[in-house]
């Protein structure tokens, strides 16, 4: 969906929907859905296609998963291209779901929490999780749409109604909200500081980090924290972009990064 690249004839792309998302089944399922199993799924894809080493590309939660995958399987990773860094630490999660985004978009936040009684608002994540995993289907869908719409509204630098409305579609909203809340309430099934404490495992891997200056979903401090501990990685902060991968400046730098990687690290037949 993004602009064609001169490197498109160099790469064989393997795209997948993680457990419970997109076209994966069962839809929005939480059983056996954790980070360890996602890493195992990625490895199964790699071995199924007889890939020895590959360039791993991921954004937002995909950047989290890419980093953890690379730290567990560094010998199979040629390089990393990461967008919208999400380190998934407790304060990173709290920024969006408790006490950060509410200060930037108070009107969107009021819409978001309107379905939660005042006496439960001291822990918004738990309140939503309880509804998203409860048996009341009406409450579940209302929570899913509210959860997903907030992210859709906050993901672009400029308001984009069409972009945000996609997040409210039932199929998308239910999977996004249920699975995100499941991971976040469990701190993404990661140990405290796991990503930062294991940078030495991937320090040698060529890496480009692309992050929007005005990213309100995963604020740019997360990319800066990562790059400060990993000076070998290249950090590109995009001056006129938010979180979404569809932001023009983000698209440009991601395509440039894939082209540059192909030129520098891949041999053409």
Segments the model singles out, each with a brief description of its role:
Residues 233-269:
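Catalytic active-site module of serine/aspartate enzymes centered on a nucleophile-bearing elbow/loop
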Residues 1-7, 11:
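Single conserved hydrophobic/aromatic residue that forms the stacking wall/gate
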Residues 202-203, 209-211:
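Short beta-strand/loop motif that positions the catalytic acidic residue
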Residues 16-33, 91:
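Glycine-rich "HGGG/HGxG" loop immediately N-terminal to the catalytic nucleophile
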Residues 216-222:
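Conserved alpha/beta-hydrolase "acid-adjacent" motif
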């Amino acid at each position: 969906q993004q602009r064609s690249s001169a490197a498109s004839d160099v790469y064989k792309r393997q795209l997948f929907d993680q457990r419970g998302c997109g076209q994966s089944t069962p839809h929005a399922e939480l059983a056996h859905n954790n980070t360890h199993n996602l890493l195992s799924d990625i490895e199964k894809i790699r071995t199924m296609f007889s890939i020895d080493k590959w360039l791993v590309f991921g954004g937002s939660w995909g950047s989290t998963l890419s980093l953890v995958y690379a730290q567990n399987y560094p010998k199979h990773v040629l390089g990393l291209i990461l967008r919208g860094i999400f380190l998934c630490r407790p304060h990173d999660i709290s920024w969006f779901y408790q006490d950060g985004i509410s200060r930037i978009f108070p009107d969107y936040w009021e819409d978001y929490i309107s379905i939660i009684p005042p006496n439960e608002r001291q822990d918004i994540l738990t309140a939503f999780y309880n509804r998203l995993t409860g048996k009341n289907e009406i409450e579940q869908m209302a929570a899913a749409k509210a959860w997903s719409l907030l992210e859709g509204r906050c993901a672009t630098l400029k308001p984009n109604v069409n972009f945000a409305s996609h997040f409210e579609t039932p199929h998308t909203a239910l999977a996004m909200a249920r699975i995100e809340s499941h991971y976040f309430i469990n701190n993404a099934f990661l140990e405290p500081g796991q990503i930062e404490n294991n940078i030495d495992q991937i320090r040698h891997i060529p890496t480009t980090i692309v992050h929007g200056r005005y990213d309100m979903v995963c604020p740019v401090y997360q990319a800066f924290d990562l790059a400060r501990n990993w000076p070998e990685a290249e950090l590109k902060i995009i001056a006129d972009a938010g979180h979404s991968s569809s932001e023009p400046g983000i698209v440009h730098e991601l395509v440039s990064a894939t082209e540059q990687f192909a030129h520098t690290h891949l041999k053409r037949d």
